[in-house]
Amino acid sequence: MYKRLVQEFFPKLDFENLEKYVNLIEFSNKNFNLTAFSGDILWKEGIFESIFTMNFIVGLVNNKENKKLKILDIGAGSGFPSIPFLITNPEIELTISESMQKRCQFLKDVSEKLDLKFNLICKPVQEINPQKFDIITARAVANLEKLEKITKKIHFPKTLLAFIKGPKVFNEVQNCKNCNYKIIKVNNNINKKIFIAFKQVS
């Protein structure tokens, strides 16, 4: 069902490469412990949700010049949300920070076998050199207070911090003093409550 929904919503994507990616996750999951998703749930909460929410996040960026966006995905694990989005939008400049070596090896395999170009940093985000990213994102990595701390040294003015969250995000906002995140609900077709906690760094 959701595999077909992906095709319907994103007709211009490289669906063959997306299928290869899904098959690679299914094949590698036993050895790398990548995700609890499989089958139709993988297409729903892994693929569709990633593309849909990343499209939404990119829409929050003021990109009147239509420049190539530089995106950092923190702790992507099996590649969510950035790899499905990269497959549908190969023009972006993607960097992934992943500290777990097994998952990092999987992401290297993804790059090679799918011929995807992205920068892979196999260490914690706190240890990477500051760069002028347009967007820093993460999904299911940490609460907002921790994300605020670990990204503090790597962003620049005008960087958009945009983190994919569930309904508990409102508690996280209350616990993150002086963080000043805005919360917006992402209307979607998978009957799931998805929120984006975001702010532009001043």
UniProtKB/Swiss-Prot annotation:
A single Gene Ontology CC term: cytosol
Residues annotated to bind S-adenosyl-L-methionine: G75, F80, V125, Q126, R139
Gene3D superfamilies reported in the protein's UniProt record: Vaccinia Virus protein VP39 (3.40.50.150)
What InterPro entries does the database record attribute to this sequence? rRNA_ssu_MeTfrase_G (IPR003682), SAM-dependent_MTases_sf (IPR029063)
Matching SUPFAM superfamilies: S-adenosyl-L-methionine-dependent methyltransferases
Please tell me whether the keyword Transport is annotated for this protein. no
Q: Where in the cell is it found?
A: Cytoplasm
Question: Keywords in UniProt for this one?
Answer: Cytoplasm, Methyltransferase, rRNA processing, S-adenosyl-L-methionine, Transferase
Ranges in coiled-coil conformation: none
Q: Give GO terms: molecular function aspect only.
A: rRNA (guanine-N7-)-methyltransferase activity
Q: Which Pfam families match?
A: GidB
Q: What is its EC number?
A: 2.1.1.-
Q: What does the record give as the function of this protein?
A: Specifically methylates the N7 position of a guanine in 16S rRNA.
HAMAP family from the entry? 16SrRNA_methyltr_G
Family membership, please give it: Belongs to the methyltransferase superfamily. RNA methyltransferase RsmG family.
This chain belongs to which protein, by name?
Ribosomal RNA small subunit methyltransferase G
* Lineage start: Bacteria, Bacillati, Mycoplasmatota, Mycoplasmoidales, Metamycoplasmataceae
Q: Coding gene?
A: rsmG
